[in-house]
């Protein structure tokens, strides 16, 4: 009788609480695995626990001083009588792993991100990033940009773009929450410094015919809510975290999607989510965004006048694009799953 085949993912967060970002990518990757392969997801959490996430067995290792010791102990036990493939998204977990990482997915280079904020430990991050690549058999990048900005200098890599689980989520039909007379602008972002939310607040201030709704949470949400309140703006709302069904409803009903960033956009998932719903997406001309956007006319400089003019010009021209076809041809679940299927077939031989 042959050994069990197991794929073990390393991530960051509890996927039942944090449902976007890296967790989405791991879910998409896992769907390409054959049915006979067992799936595990490991992360550092608030306590030691086990639970199921779809068909993936999740292992939370308590975030304490002994977490890396417990990680290696668990893996040694799990892989003792099985063929294990370790697919990591977490630099630190791979760095302290005694085994080699089979596949390492790069969302943003560790040194690149720390350099953008001039982090005081950026040289330590540089060392960690290089060490992880040396310990990885194959490196997967989610865009050409992430490859170019990484410290990886070998040839054993692959580029596979992201897709979105929203494709399989049913739209939740609810009462309309928009002012039907205004141009409806929607965005899904983590509320942090790099996403340039100030630009949307400026846009709301400049043009009262725009109604802007932002889905997402983050460390600066109360700061920006206070700013909106102090400026007495009633045409922009930070809605906080929304379930996927509601997000699909807002995408479906909006006129425009924006994806703004100062840096650190290794792919730009909300761009393809906008295209899934056949919406025009205006996004910052930074990072990986230019290689994902349908046409450069939708790229904006991080300037409120440029952003406003681009939107108004598009609405006047009413030029026709098949955004949905662009999504399904380049980023659809089936297209991306097929690429991961070929990757895992090669790795699991």
Summary of predicted features, one role per range:
Residues 295-305, 312-318:
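Conserved acidic donor-binding segment of nucleotide-sugar-dependent glycosyltransferases
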Residues 241-242, 249-254:
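Short alpha-helical donor nucleotide-sugar binding micro-motif in glycosyltransferases
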Residues 225-242:
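Nucleotide-activated donor-binding/catalytic signature segment of Leloir-type glycosyltransferases, i.e.
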Residues 8-9, 140, 177-195, 201-204, ...:
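Conserved donor-binding/catalytic core segment of Leloir-type glycosyltransferases
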Residues 316-348:
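A charged, aromatic-enriched C-terminal amphipathic alpha-helix characteristic of glycosyltransferases
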Residues 271, 280-283:
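Short hydrophobic beta-strand element within catalytic cores of glycosyltransferases
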Residues 87-93, 106:
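Short His-centered aromatic/hydrophobic patch
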Residues 121-139, 152:
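Membrane-proximal helix-turn-helix segments that form the acceptor-binding/catalytic region
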């Amino acid at each position: 009788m042959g050994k069990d085949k197991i794929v073990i993912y390393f991530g960051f967060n509890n996927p039942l609480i944090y449902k976007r970002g890296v967790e989405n990518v791991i879910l998409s990757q896992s769907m390409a695995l054959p049915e006979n392969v067992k799936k595990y997801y490991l992360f550092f959490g608030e306590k030691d626990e086990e639970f199921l996430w779809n068909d993936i067995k999740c292992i939370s290792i308590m975030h304490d001083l002994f977490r890396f010791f417990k990680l290696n102990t668990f893996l040694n036990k799990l892989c003792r009588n099985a063929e294990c493939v370790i697919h990591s998204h977490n630099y630190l977990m791979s760095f302290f792993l005694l085994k080699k990482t089979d596949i390492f997915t790069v969302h943003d280079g560790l040194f690149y991100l720390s350099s953008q904020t001039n982090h005081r430990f950026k040289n330590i991050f540089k060392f960690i990033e290089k060490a992880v690549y040396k310990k990885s058999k194959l490196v997967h990048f989610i865009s050409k940009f992430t490859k170019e900005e990484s410290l990886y200098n070998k040839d054993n890599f692959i580029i596979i773009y992201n897709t979105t689980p929203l494709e399989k989520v049913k739209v939740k039909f609810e009462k309309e929450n928009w002012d039907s007379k205004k141009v409806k602008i929607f965005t899904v972002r983590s509320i942090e410094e790099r996403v340039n939310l100030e630009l949307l607040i400026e846009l709301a201030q400049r043009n009262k015919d725009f109604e802007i709704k932002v889905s997402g949470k983050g460390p600066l949400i109360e700061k920006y809510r206070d700013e909106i309140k102090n400026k007495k703006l009633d045409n922009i709302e930070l809605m906080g975290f929304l379930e996927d069904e509601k997000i699909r409803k807002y995408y479906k009903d909006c006129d425009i999607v924006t994806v703004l960033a100062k840096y650190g956009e290794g792919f730009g998932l909300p761009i393809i989510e906008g295209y899934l719903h056949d919406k025009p997406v205006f996004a910052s001309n930074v990072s990986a965004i230019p290689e994902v956007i349908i046409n450069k006319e939708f790229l904006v400089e991080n300037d409120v006048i440029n952003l406003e003019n681009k939107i108004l010009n598009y609405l006047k021209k009413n030029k026709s694009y098949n955004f949905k076809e662009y999504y399904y041809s380049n980023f659809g679940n089936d297209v991306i799953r097929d690429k991961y299927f070929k990757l895992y077939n090669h790795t699991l031989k």
